[in-house]
Amino acid sequence: MRCLSIFVLLVLLVSFAVAELDVEGEIVKQLLTRGTLKDADFWKRLEMQGCVCNANAKFCCGEGR
C-alpha cells in the first residue's frame, strides 16, 4: 500500500513538472516565432495558470498575481 501511494505521488509530481515545462516552452516558442509578447490569448492562458508579466515583457511563473 505504501508503494502505491509513493507511485501516485511520483506520477502527480511528474505530470506537474511536464505542465510547467509546457508553459515555459510555449513562452519560448512565442518569443521565437513572433518576436513579441503582445498576443492577448497567450497572456490570458498564462494568467489562468498563475503566471504574471510586467511592462518590460519579462515573466515569472509560479509567483501568483
Curated annotation (Swiss-Prot):
GO terms for cellular component: extracellular region. Keywords: Amidation, Disulfide bond, Ion channel impairing toxin, Neurotoxin, Pyrrolidone carboxylic acid, Secreted, Signal, Toxin. Residues 20-48 form a propeptide. The cysteine framework is XVI (C-C-CC). Probable neurotoxin with unknown target. Possibly targets ion channels. It is found in: Secreted. The modification Pyrrolidone carboxylic acid is found at Q49. The modification Glutamic acid 1-amide is found at E63. Its main location: secreted. This is Conotoxin Cal16.1. GO terms for molecular function: ion channel regulator activity; toxin activity. Expressed by the venom duct. Residues 1-19 form the signal peptide. Disulfide bonds join C51-C60, C53-C61.
